[in-house]
Amino acid sequence: MEPSPADPLVLIVEDDRSLRLMYREHLLMSGFRTIDAHNGHQALEKARDLHPDAVVTDLAVPGMDGFEFCRALQQLPETRTIPILAVTGHSEYLDDPTRFRHSGIVQVLIKPCEPAEIVRELRRLIHVGPAPLHG
């Protein structure tokens, strides 16, 4: 089934090509349109240009890491309201919830996570919207 222009657009930021392709496939099958980036700089450019409805980002991507990328999104008026779902293999990141909040990250999933879990969280986030930032 071809995605419709009315389907939500999700930016996938993942340096692991196989994961990026798997996320893309599952999102397309679940009624999302996708764009992807393999590093934070490329992701920021695509987010500014294409205004996705949500972002799924790994936190350990080359160049500008996922936290820096998310903070950069929060600083731009045109991207600051985009809900961000982070996926990471670093469970120790969960020890510092303020780091997520200050980066604008709304939800975090620990890898390995099921693509269905990503789809479920994205559906929730797109309808709920981003959490307000508390400084």
Description of each model-found segment:
Residues 14:
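Conserved acidic carboxylate
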Residues 31-38, 46:
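Short hydrophobic/Thr-rich beta-strand motif most characteristic of the beta2 strand and flanking loop
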Residues 21-29:
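Charged docking surfaces used in two-component/phosphorelay signaling
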Residues 50-56:
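Active-site beta3 strand of CheY-like receiver
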Residues 58, 88:
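Active-site residues of response regulator receiver
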Residues 113-122:
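C-terminal output helix
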Residues 61:
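Receiver (REC) domain active-site loop signature in two-component systems and cognate sites
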